[in-house]
């Protein structure tokens, strides 16, 4: 059974002490828009409301980036990743990168 690690946006883990900082870990994914979904999204943009196709795409991208970051932390033998953050950037027309990063640590 694979060990679960703690993922938190805070700098500390309650009731635990950082024994060792292992370094920055990250996971990323680049996603492109589907032409058909882009047309539907454009129509929704005219009338207003949530663009569900993009919401779903970004949710999936966040999870993929987070899972890749966790995989890197496990390779280092981390017990936790603290100070986790997400960022996005446009890599080219119609495509965006989602990056998850944090500090891998061992806990006492």
From Swiss-Prot:
Stretches of the chain forming a coiled coil according to its record: none
Family to which the UniProt record says this protein belongs: Belongs to the UPF0145 family.
Name of the protein in its database record: UPF0145 protein AF_0869
Species: Archaeoglobus fulgidus (strain ATCC 49558 / DSM 4304 / JCM 9628 / NBRC 100126 / VC-16)
Lineage: Archaea, Methanobacteriati, Methanobacteriota, Archaeoglobi, Archaeoglobales
